[in-house]
């Protein structure tokens, strides 16, 4: 007997209209045998659910999404903004590990990626940043696709958004520029903030050190440099907004979602026509196949998508041969060009009030009223985007342009509690007993020029691939991160902070020279988990790259890729918003090709 299917519906009594939504299936055996799917989306993450939802707006098309993880509705913590930090390393995480990183003293880094419906939009820190105008214009130049230029993509980014005040109904005046935001989209975005004294000190610093830390009203206007209020993908009800909640839940019942099932390969239906998806529940289970009438859209993310392509015989011929995979399309660019951000955590001793709270009590409060400390994205609510002066750059400018930042400061909390050493990507920090209350934030090199790779470990689709970030592989990357630490120290040495900050704890205050700071960074740098580029988009007839400007995999028909892997380089910001924008744009491109 088939397992229970979740057909979610609501009946509007007036007019007797029935509003149906996507149908979910827990096991491949539950799939209906009488449905031919026009499109099969391999991966139900941030991009995959956007594409499935948009294609599903055509009621004549049947769409199937195959997702390796469970439903987001099964995991309470994915709903609560303040519980985001509990999700990495949990059962809804792929729990990847990189190969030893040469420039990090041979350390292997944990690499968190979501394995759940909604992907990283269900699992991340919810920060909503578009990147700079320069980023988008650079991508347009690199790919030969002018539709990706800032002026062309901005209407699509605004189309994504449903911007509103947060649960507290605090005015957003002075925190955002309403003219650069959308109000009618699917994805909820808020300028969520808490009233803490730290905010006032930061704003005072923008007046004192205006050249380095100017105040920026809205970081999402395309010119993000400066200190700005954070924006989050949280709805007015203080719940996380993700591609699962914002897109899938408003989708018709012509969209089917198969959960807990791994896509193993894309199989050719002809010599270069790849429209058949192979999938299985586990490594020992039977492999099943379904063929899309029109196309397969691969949306596994920047690690899983190249792994699936390589297991399908699309990749570097010599590398595939080495692991026993027959080459069907020889493309050495598959899995190359990993572009990511390097970061380090800094701690400053302070007499400011801490932002700690009783988590159990906060969960009760959130359950009862959707308010309290767990209703916001973080206890501290600012980001700073720093552009280094030319004299502080080591070599050529790695940013996308003159209006783009090199460094990000992301503030997290003021606390005596510091992350344990087993937190993903984390390294040993000062012992709890050796410090008091500390201001905690990340210093991020936004423009790493080092490039890494994702490659097959073997020909078992259920094995983790080899992930080499080549973190700090170029000297310029560590030089910029070092300048970021210097900049952070200047900020917290300002007149505004002097009465409240007693110096740097991590790195220790006695580490001041460039040489000593570099040694510190080699042992403490981690990934900021914003990897892109493994299946990079490139011009139509380019000799490099994996997908054309229409997202089709070069050398194939019937197969496109839509996710972070196609973005050529990491933006000067977080990657969530660009992935939404790429997915919305791809949906338009795909639909138009069948119009």
From Swiss-Prot:
GO molecular function per UniProt: flavin adenine dinucleotide binding; pyranose dehydrogenase (acceptor) activity
Assigned GO CC terms: extracellular region
Keyword Flavoprotein: yes
UniProt entry tagged with the keyword Signal: yes
PTM per Swiss-Prot/TrEMBL: N-glycosylated.
Signal peptide span: 1-21
Gene3D superfamilies linked to this entry: FAD/NAD(P)-binding domain, Glucose Oxidase, domain 3
Modified residues (Tele-8alpha-FAD histidine): 123
Cofactors (names): FAD
Listed InterPro entries: FAD/NAD-bd_sf, GMC_OxRdtase, GMC_OxRdtase_N, GMC_OxRtase_C
Pfam family, one: GMC_oxred_N
Positions annotated as glycosylated: 95, 110, 195, 337, 367, 502, 510, 541
Catalytic activity: pyranose + acceptor = pyranos-2-ulose + reduced acceptor; pyranose + acceptor = pyranos-3-ulose + reduced acceptor; pyranose + acceptor = pyranos-2,3-diulose + reduced acceptor; a pyranoside + acceptor = a pyranosid-3-ulose + reduced acceptor
Family: Belongs to the GMC oxidoreductase family.
Protein name: Pyranose dehydrogenase
């Amino acid at each position: 007997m088939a397992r229970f299917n979740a057909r979610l519906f609501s009946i509007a009594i007036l007019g007797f209209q029935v509003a149906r939504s996507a149908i979910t299936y827990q096991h491949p055996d539950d799939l209906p045998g009488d449905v031919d799917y026009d499109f099969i989306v391999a991966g139900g993450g941030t991009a995959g659910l956007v594409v499935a939802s948009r294609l599903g707006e055509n009621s004549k098309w049947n769409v199937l999404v195959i997702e390796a993880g469970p439903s987001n509705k099964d995991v309470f913590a994915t709903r609560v903004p303040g519980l985001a930090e509990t999700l990495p390393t949990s059962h809804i995480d792929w729990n990847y590990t990189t190969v030893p990183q040469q420039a990090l003293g041979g350390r292997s880094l944990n690499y968190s990626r979501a394995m759940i419906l909604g992907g990283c939009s269900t699992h991340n820190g919810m920060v909503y940043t578009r990147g700079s105008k320069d980023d988008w214009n650079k991508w347009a130049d690199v790919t030969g696709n002018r539709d990706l230029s800032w002026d062309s993509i901005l209407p699509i980014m605004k189309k994504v958004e449903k911007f509103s005040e947060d649960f507290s109904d605090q005015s957003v005046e002075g925190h955002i520029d309403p003219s650069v935001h959308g109000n009618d989209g699917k994805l909820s975005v808020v300028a969520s903030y808490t009233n803490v004294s730290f905010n006032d000190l930061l704003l005072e610093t923008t007046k004192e050190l205006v050249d380095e830390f100017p105040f920026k009203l809205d970081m999402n206007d395309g010119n993000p440099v400066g200190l700005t209020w954070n924006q989050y993908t949280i709805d007015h009800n203080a719940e996380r907004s993700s591609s699962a909640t914002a897109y899938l839940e408003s989708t018709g019942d012509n969209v089917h979602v198969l959960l807990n099932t791994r896509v193993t390969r894309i199989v050719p239906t002809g010599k270069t026509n790849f429209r058949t998806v192979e999938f299985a529940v586990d490594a020992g289970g039977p492999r099943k196949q379904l063929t899309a009438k029109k196309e397969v859209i691969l949306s596994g993310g920047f690690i899983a998508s190249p792994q699936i392509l390589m297991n399908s015989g699309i990749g570097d011929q010599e590398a595939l041969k080495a692991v026993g995979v027959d080459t069907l399309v020889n493309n050495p660019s598959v899995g190359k060009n990993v572009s990511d951000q390097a970061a380090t955590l800094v701690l400053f001793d302070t007499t400011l009030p801490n932002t700690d709270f009783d988590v159990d009590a906060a969960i009760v409060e959130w359950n009862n009223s959707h308010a309290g400390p767990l209703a916001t994205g973080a206890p501290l609510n600012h980001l700073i985007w720093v552009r280094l002066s030319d004299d502080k750059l080591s070599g050529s400018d790695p940013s996308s342009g003159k209006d783009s930042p090199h460094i990000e400061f992301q503030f997290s909390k003021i606390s005596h509690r510091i992350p344990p050493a087993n937190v993903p990507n984390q390294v040993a920090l000062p012992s709890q007993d050796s410090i008091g209350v500390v201001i905690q934030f990340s210093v991020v090199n936004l423009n790493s020029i080092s490039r890494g790779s994702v490659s097959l470990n073997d020909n078992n689709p259920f094995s983790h691939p080899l992930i080499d970030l080549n973190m700090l592989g170029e000297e310029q990357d560590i030089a910029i991160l070092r300048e970021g630490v210097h900049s952070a120290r200047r900020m917290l040495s300002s007149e505004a902070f002097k009465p409240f900050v007693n110096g740097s704890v991590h790195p220790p205050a006695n580490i001041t020279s460039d040489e000593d700071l570099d040694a510190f960074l080699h042992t403490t740098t981690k990934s900021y988990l914003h990897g892109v580029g493994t299946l990079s988009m490139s011009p139509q007839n380019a000799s490099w790259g994996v997908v054309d400007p229409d997202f089709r995999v070069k050398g194939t028909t019937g197969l496109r890729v839509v996710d972070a892997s196609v973005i050529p380089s990491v933006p000067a910001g977080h990657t969530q918003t660009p992935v939404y924008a790429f997915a919305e744009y791809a949906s338009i491109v795909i639909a138009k090709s069948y119009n």
